[in-house]
């Protein structure tokens, strides 16, 4: 079973011999299969820096990250990333975009296309597999990005504000899609957002981070994602008095620590 361990992680920004900024300070976090962890906090609290370290895009200044006991020293196929901007290749078809990671790993075209169509079906886009991505709406492009991240069957899904640029209705539909995929595949998910409501709805565990330097100020274990999987009614979940109480408490906490 996969386990992601973040042990006393600190990150300094700056140049050798010059002034440095402590972006993250002594972050400790453990995630196991089926955990959906959401990081929430004011701008500058280190959320994206933390995700970049987990992805292997950055090296920590102190501490380490381990995936199933192995220290993370760079990007790897066991960690899929979905960015705020979809980062798709506009000259490729939808299916070829989804299959890109498999192509780079030397997988045969027949197998790449089989997996691409399977993952596109999972996000409701199998009918547009042959289209160029520039013909798709923003929400559809982001679903292609999710399918691409799933194509290599990663143990960990890293999602850096993937819904921030979408309209409210599209955002809600993709939130529901993400939870259904998580419930089915039981991957570790680490998700960044600025939306308190989105964080409460998606997270099984919510970490609220403080800035200057970035630290985990508070951790919440939450029931709402699993409630949605059971009932399928997002509006009912978000209208629950317990959901509203958590929302107000967390907004107050973020204001107090910003």
Swiss-Prot record:
Signal peptide: none annotated. Its main location: membrane. It holds the Pfam family ABC_tran. PROSITE patterns: ABC_TRANSPORTER_1 (PS00211), ABC_TRANSPORTER_2 (PS50893), TAUB (PS51250). It is a peripheral membrane protein. SUPFAM superfamilies: P-loop containing nucleoside triphosphate hydrolases. One of its GO terms (molecular function) is ATP hydrolysis activity. One of its GO terms (cellular component) is plasma membrane. Keywords: ATP-binding, Cell inner membrane, Cell membrane, Membrane, Nucleotide-binding, Translocase, Transport. It catalyses: taurine(out) + ATP + H2O = taurine(in) + ADP + phosphate + H(+). The keyword Mitochondrion does not apply. ATP binds at residues 41-48. Its EC number is 7.6.2.7. The keyword Magnesium does not apply. It is found in: Cell inner membrane. The complex is composed of two ATP-binding proteins (TauB), two transmembrane proteins (TauC) and a solute-binding protein (TauA). Part of the ABC transporter complex TauABC involved in taurine import. Responsible for energy coupling to the transport system. Belongs to the ABC transporter superfamily. Taurine importer (TC 3.A.1.17.1) family. This is Taurine import ATP-binding protein TauB. It comes from Cupriavidus necator (strain ATCC 17699 / DSM 428 / KCTC 22496 / NCIMB 10442 / H16 / Stanier 337) (Ralstonia eutropha).
